[in-house]
Amino acid sequence: MMKYRYTYYVLLCLTLVGLASCEMKDELLGKGEQGGSGEVGVLDLKLKVVPPSYGNGGVSSKSSSTELIVPKAEDMIVKVFNASMELQDYFESYADYLKESQYVLEQGTYYIEAYSGDNYEVTSEYPYYELLDTCVIKAKEVTLVDKACELQSAILYLTLSEEFLNACKDDYAITITNGSGVLSVGKGDARIVYIRPGMKTTVTIRATEKITGKPVIWTFGLADSEGKINSQDLFRIEIKDLE
């Protein structure tokens, strides 16, 4: 008698599992509460982060004061907006999105935004990476979006020559401002600065000559031929002297 009860219990469990699987499938295919209309599909978002490449003489992408900071793809914030630009879903990180076994959406047009955090005006710590894309979800289909977050900041790469370091005291300060934000760089600070694109950025160097004790100031601007700064612009500045 116990044998038959055990067999019945196993069959009942298998039946329940099968029903659950069917319900999940019906949800994806638009059945059940959707009334068989087939109105939903799946968004399969494949996200990566691609740093800029400047070739020889550019900057590398590791993690010291003279190398690019590159965020991890799993740390990107992800937002999904519907066709009316209303926020559909918000994920604190791409890693949270990946926890979804299947990300189901009603059919229609969606806008995807993935980004690394705040878009600072001037910073040495938080380069701004971003992805903006549009996709169309079709009923009963999986829509693949395989895209890369790319750097949206401009880069200022500062190098101090031996000539400058020998001539000036260690109390020098380099101030970078784009009119909205400002950053001061001193001895031991990062030599790569990330700037939000926009109008011309001004760099001011203040130092003291070792021999004379005379304060010196040097100011110059960063911009393209149109007086602007664009995403991924690279400004390599070697400071040799202040004459």
Walk through the language-model features, giving the residues of each.
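Sec-dependent bacterial lipoprotein signal peptides
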Residues: 1-23
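Sec-type signal peptide cleavage vicinity
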Residues: 22-190, 197-243
